Structure formats: C-alpha cells, structure tokens
Amino acid sequence: GLPVCGETCVTGSCYTPGCTCSWPVCTRN
C-alpha cells in the first residue's frame, strides 16, 4: 500500500503489521 510505514528498522526488525524492512526504513505494498 503506502511505500513508507513511518517506522525505521535500523535494528533489522519492523513491528508494524504488514511492513518489511528495507533498511533503514520499513515499507509495505
């Protein structure tokens, strides 16, 4: 959906459902 989840994943993990890590930010379809 939105390209950015408003979450960073510098540690390599995303906590927002449906988001994946595209370092250093979380993204989703």
Swiss-Prot record:
Cyclopeptide (Gly-Asn) crosslink - at what positions? G1-N29
UniProt PTM:
This is a cyclic peptide.
Extract the Pfam families matched here: Cyclotide
Q: Report keywords, A-Z.
A: Disulfide bond, Knottin, Plant defense
Record remark: domains: The presence of a 'disulfide through disulfide knot' structurally defines this protein as a knottin.
Signal peptide as annotated in the record? none
- A biological process from GO: defense response
Which tissues carry this protein? Expressed in leaves, petals, petioles, and runners but not in roots (at protein level).
This molecule's function is given as: Probably participates in a plant defense mechanism.
Entry protein name:
Cycloviolacin-O21
Which family, according to UniProt? Belongs to the cyclotide family. Moebius subfamily.
**Which cysteines are disulphide-bonded?**
C5-C19, C9-C21, C14-C26
